[in-house]
Amino acid sequence: MNDTKQKLMNVTRQMIDNGGIDSVSMREIGKKMQLSRSAVYRHFKNKEDLLAAIVVENFEMLESSIGNSIKGINNPVKLLESILINYYDFGLKNRDHYRLMFGREWDKEQYPEVYAAAFKTFDTSAAFLAKAQEQKCIINKPTKVITAMVYAFIHGLVELRFAGHDEPEKGLNDPHSLISSFLSMIRV
């Protein structure tokens, strides 16, 4: 990737961080970088193309963050707990980016790189779950099913927090405890 393209992505990332996804426009990006609008379009076909590149980068960041969080953890259940806490924290710290990654459907044909990056992250989680199953630490269900269950749980937990439905009266105010409890439900 060339410098200008990466700088365009960095400016876009800052715009999302400061003003949300709706604050991003090709014209505004060009202005911030002192480029003509046509110069921006030489690197990205449109705003959607640029956002797709950001999403791929976000998945790479999440994957890296997960990798760093599990270094040195040998216990499969503790490893899964670390992954889920990492997902949760990533979502909260990067709300708009998380919504861009998980809150919209990306066309597989038009943006295969987004699909590949998302699937790589899913497959990484599935591999850890499969390993935990091999070691007889979690329930014996098809790996795809158990991974889908884990994904549904953690994404639901993040979305409940985003919506402000993490009230103590519902028992939703302690995500780490909920993650631990969820894992105890799938342990053998």
Residue ranges, per PLM feature:
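An amphipathic alpha-helix signature
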Residues: 81, 85, 122, 126-130, ...
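Short hydrophobic/aromatic patch on the recognition helix
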Residues: 34-44
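A short, glycine- and basic residue-enriched loop/turn
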Residues: 5, 21-23, 38, 47-48, ...
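Hydrophobic/aromatic-rich alpha-helical bundle segments in the mid-to-C-terminal region
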Residues: 103, 111, 133-181
